[in-house]
Amino acid sequence: EPWLKDQKVGVIGSGEFQVSRHINVATVQTLASFLEEPPRDATPDKKSYHLKRRDLVKRFLSSVSLLILEEAHESSGSNFYDIARLCVNADYRLALTATPFMKDSTEANMRLMAVAGRIEIKVTEKYLIDRGILAKPYFLYHKVAYKPDEVRIKAELANKHLNFRVGMSTAYQKAYQLGIVYNLGRNEAIVREALLYKQHSLNCMTLVRLKRHGQILMEMMKESGLRVDFIYGESNQSTRQAKLNSLASGEIDVLIGSTILDVGVDVPSVGAVILAGGGKAEVEMRQRVGRGLRAKKNQANVCFITDFIDISNKYLLSHSYERKHIIDTTPGFAEGVLPIDGAFDFGVLKRD
């Protein structure tokens, strides 16, 4: 910002510990590591250094008068919460989050209330979409039944289940593993959607919950001729960024991502998102939809989002409609919901 041109900004994180008098930016991970107890096997000198630094950080936090919390819903985590509690003189607090008080845990929501207070300013999705700050989303749901991936199931799950049937009353864990991860019909539908997006020159992010599901989809997409890569929990930061850059530049058609992409990652603008992982958590759902809503430049400011209605099991079916209900009841999202098993109108790419 022009008015901050000559202002010194302190940085605490990424190997830096430079504190400024007025403005400082810090990562939760770095502050939390400084506030930990020193390792038991530390030498006396290292232990003394750690304790002095911890005392310095505590005094620094107590001096803060304005606390700005980015991704404030993460304050439900102990590190984030403990750091905020140490800012005892932060009478002014600005908490920024797209998912306030939406955790399944009452305790988690109360922690956010404790460190940030009630909602004072609410900016809706519709407000941002109508002004072009977010891309206009279109949602399409496909009903899918269970078609077992017999080859992979026999090779990988032979000793895990007595049978590989999925019915309406099948227990959730088994239903999810077979009906989502090892569901050949569902995975084939995901690949078809990715191919459709490629035909319309749309880069695509496919989001899963389990690493094995991402691996299976990557194998199937490569077999179909798609250029695809996969980011998961074990991927280091430089690897993640390189793969995200490949998606942004068009080097790959599809980037598959696990829950590592839900928060804290600078995701490039994408034209399409496939929600392949099921589930029902509202925070996760909104974060994943948000991966595709970054405003587009030099192209239509829209995003196509595919999800599935899993009809093979009562738990999967219930979760499907819970996800759909979130979209149906969100102004700005609801207007773009298409009939189940309908078709996208890719003509909007030219009209918009």
Which ranges hold each PLM region?
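Inter-Walker segment of RecA-like/P-loop motor cores
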Residues: 2-51, 243
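Conserved helicase ATPase core of P-loop NTP-dependent helicases/translocases
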Residues: 8-20, 36, 203-205, 215-262
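Structural recognition of the conserved hydrophobic beta-strand(s) that form the central parallel beta-sheet
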Residues: 24-27, 91-98, 254-257
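Conserved Walker B
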Residues: 28, 64-67, 71-73, 261, ...
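Post-DEXD/H (motif II) to motif III coupling segment of the RecA-like Helicase ATP-binding lobe
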Residues: 65-66, 71-141, 145, 327
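A short beta-strand element within the Helicase C-terminal
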Residues: 110, 254-257, 262-278, 284, ...
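Conserved interdomain hinge at the start of the Helicase C-terminal
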Residues: 159-222
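Conserved segment of the helicase C-terminal RecA-like domain
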Residues: 291-324
